[in-house]
């Protein structure tokens, strides 16, 4: 591919296209990948469709002002995002250790973007072009639009609008608001006059003209009073709906952060249009010499079926970003994309995913949402399925069957996560059987996250009984179809509500599983989630109940070690945790003991685990009839 297949990145590109001045310039913390899994590509192509010229400055050197000037000054303004992931999450682990890789950067190496990228980029743009409008968006800006607890500073920070000095913030999925805002700018409206576009947030000194709004506790209140913080979050949480949500206002000293109600969800036709735009579907050729961009590998042959999630896991911020209403593409649109993939020269016959935040949530949860919006005080699937929930996998299954029939398609995988409780609610087993027979390869990843009902309740996850029933059914189905496939559980330690007793309960469950799970992570308090509010305040904002929060690094290390108690390096911490919890009965050589009396000889865990994995899985299969678990994916995306 040539540079002409991509949006312009240099003055040379502008000359070839006869562009003197760009309408917009997108500054992003990711490398430039022109694929619909990347927000920069979508917004750039949507604006191009509307007749605007758009340039890309990807991963500029924030220590060199000239990098921000290389495409000149745009006619209407700069659009700034940190990339597909919050820059702080991208740079640091849950234990605040620096990461050494970055899948969204050349060669997978870190160091191409600054901490708090949105703030840094905006300040540099202001330095280069003082009067040029700046609009911020993407995950980092969206989840920091109000005063928020910042785990890395361990303090409450102001709205990112204040710290970045940006003129406007677009939250959530930005196609509709950016089109409306860009057209208003084209018609001659000044950026500081754009105050009525849904899905936007701005700063105002005088709120007297506002009507029908809710004022939440101020920055000064939430930064000094944890009850006020919890109250502010509760209001934000309940008002994230395009039909019933109200304008929200939060005072920051003498100014106010004003959030307009969310944009309506995209219609199916609008979704189809967005995903049919002329993406190059790969990274820019300028990265070839550095080994390309690793992030493209998993998504290049994956298909986004829908957006949104009504699972409402407490540790996930999707409610604040994509929303609870499912927005799906038509089958025709998805089949066209699948057919197009088969004609790509590096297609090997495998479509890696057809899904979204949760693969088997392909339609709105219920008909009520269409007229009244999402329910304010209850969830669709937690603590149990709502009576209005539409439980049906037929349409999704018919789509998968059609994709499987496309010439040159060997296998269609589902990797974006299956919500197992929703699967169990479906009395028709056809999808479950087809999933096991055609759409996994040896193992299925799902996310029970924990097995203590006390912790699961705070996580917004189904009870242990639901998971155990799922495990039994999964293995029963695999036995009937003569497949020896396994479950890989994603588990989480140190979530609010998880004390040593709960961690030990989970460790005992793992013991019965028969193998050491590798997919374990500590709870990561990222902006925008209900769990992060619990972590900071020690309060469940929705119930106002006090919540135990493991914050000391020692206890967090103990809890994580308990989940991998068989690793020799974890022996001392596990023993200390068991003694502290008065569970010495789990130390010894008995069948239920987690560790022996004496520290085992240190072996290479990886080598040993690889050697025994098949044996352990075979044990696991037998044990699974009694107990077992599953799992799911990513930082941002554990279902």
From Swiss-Prot:
The residue ranges flagged as biased composition, category Basic residues, are 600-610, 626-639
Task: Give start and end of each Radical SAM core domain.
Answer: 295-566
Family, according to the entry, reads as follows: Belongs to the UPF0313 family.
Q: Which UniProt keywords apply?
A: 4Fe-4S, Iron, Iron-sulfur, Metal-binding, S-adenosyl-L-methionine
Q: What is the lineage of its organism?
A: Bacteria, Bacillati, Bacillota, Clostridia, Eubacteriales
Among SUPFAM superfamilies, the record links this protein to: Radical SAM enzymes
Give the cofactor binding note. Answer: Binds 1 [4Fe-4S] cluster. The cluster is coordinated with 3 cysteines and an exchangeable S-adenosyl-L-methionine.
What organism does the record attribute this protein to? Clostridium botulinum (strain 657 / Type Ba4)
Q: Which Pfam families match?
A: DUF3362 (PF11842), Radical_SAM (PF04055), Radical_SAM_N (PF08497)
Q: Where is this region: Disordered?
A: 597-639
Instruction: Please report the name of this protein according to its UniProt entry.
Output: UPF0313 protein CLJ_B0249
